[in-house]
Amino acid sequence: MRISSTFLFNLNLMMKKLISIFVLLCCIASLSANPIHGLLERIDKGASKKFIIQQQKSDVDFFELDQKGDKVVIRGNNYVSIATGLNWYLKYHAGIHLSWNGMTADLPEVLPAVTEKERHETNLPYRYAYNYCTFSYSMAFWDWERWQQEIDWMALHGVNLSLSLTGAETVWKNVLTKLGYSKDEINAFVSGSGFTAWWLMNNLEGWGGPNPDSWYVQQAELQKKIVKRMREYGIHPVL
């Protein structure tokens, strides 16, 4: 069967359109996966329009501050480095302190200019956060909104390796269920959030439970969000 030139022309045109759509979708996915944009918007609505964010390959973790027109340029080898650079700029150039209890700020309409390019780097490959006890002190009853703030705080301070225990209770429940333990036995063994640290360290004899079924589901869903956001930044979760 002969293929007409008109058919080939239309086929070629259709393929070009499909490729263009694919490239556009990839660009959109890339933009939406950039956590710095979301971080800036959470700090101050509209803040992302005041910065230029650039990634640049490097053998060491680094960030640079620069200026292009009326926009501040923050350059780094990964998103954690860039977030650290953002925190440095806000603190030492704009006079804005983002505290552990307050992660929002009113940025000036025109940001203070970076008059001279500035670079900072580190040879330390891992910056670790947290221990078991933290999860039963500060974090025991955090929701996603509070966890989102915490992950932002980690990135702003250069953390790239973090203990991530939320949802471990659900994993234990699922494993014990598959091994044939009853619901009552599991509930007597798995502790609540306020005691998780000591339970996981094997020094808890009992507690006043049990946990509701909805709590296990809630913890699992929360951990999925936590790990997803950590990986978007490039923070490695220690499970």
Locate predicted features.
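Feature activates predominantly on carbohydrate-active enzymes
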Residues: 35-39, 45, 54-60, 68-239
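Sec-dependent N-terminal signal peptides
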Residues: 18-27
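A short, Trp-centered hydrophobic/proline-enriched beta-strand micro-motif
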Residues: 49-51
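Positively charged n-region of N-terminal signal peptides that target proteins for export
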Residues: 2-3, 12-18
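Boundary at the C-terminal end of the N-terminal hydrophobic targeting segment
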Residues: 31-33
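Prokaryotic Sec-type signal peptides and long signal-anchor helices
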Residues: 11-13, 26, 193
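Aromatic (phenylalanine/tyrosine) cluster motif
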Residues: 7-9
